[in-house]
Amino acid sequence: HVLDTVRRLAMAHPEIAFSLRDGERQVLKLSHAQGDMIDARLDRLDAIMGNNFAANAIPIETDRDGLFLSGFAGLPTLNRGNASHQYLFVNGRPVRDKLLYGAVRGAYRDFLAHDRHALIALFLDVPPEAVDINVHPAKTEVRFRDSGLVRGLIVSALKHALAAAGHRAS
C-alpha cells in the first residue's frame, strides 16, 4: 500500500525525486526531472509502469468547458489482466473514482477484450468548484458537478487519440 501511494505521488510530481526503502532494501528510487515536463512525465511513467510503456503510449491533451485532460494512454496492444496500471489524477491528486475508470473502460471497449485493461495515466484539471473532493475521508474518491462532461471528455479524448494512432474499433 505504501509503495502504491508513493508511486502515485511520484507520477503526479516528476519534478521531485522519490526514494523508498524497506530496511536495507531500496524499493524505489526516482531522480527529479529536468527540462520539458511532458517528456519528464513520460519518463517517470515509464520508470514506474515498466512494460516499455513509453514506447507503447500515446499522448493525451485536450480541453473542454474549463476541463483540461492530459497524460498518456497505452496502445491496445499493451494491456493487462487487471486494472492495476490505470492511474488517474484530479487536480494533481491521485484518485480511484468509478466514473473515471468507467470512462476509460468505455473508451477502450471496442479495442480490448472484456477481461483486458489498458495501461494509462490521466491527469484531469478542473476548476475547484466543479469537483467535491470530500466524498471519502482519504480523498481518493471525487464527485463532479457535471459527471457527463467529464466522462465525455475522457472517452472522446481516448478514442480520438487511439484512432489518430491508427487503431480502429473492432
Regions found by a protein language model. Name each.
Residues H1-S170:
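N-terminal phosphate-binding caps/lids of nucleotide- and nucleic-acid-binding domains
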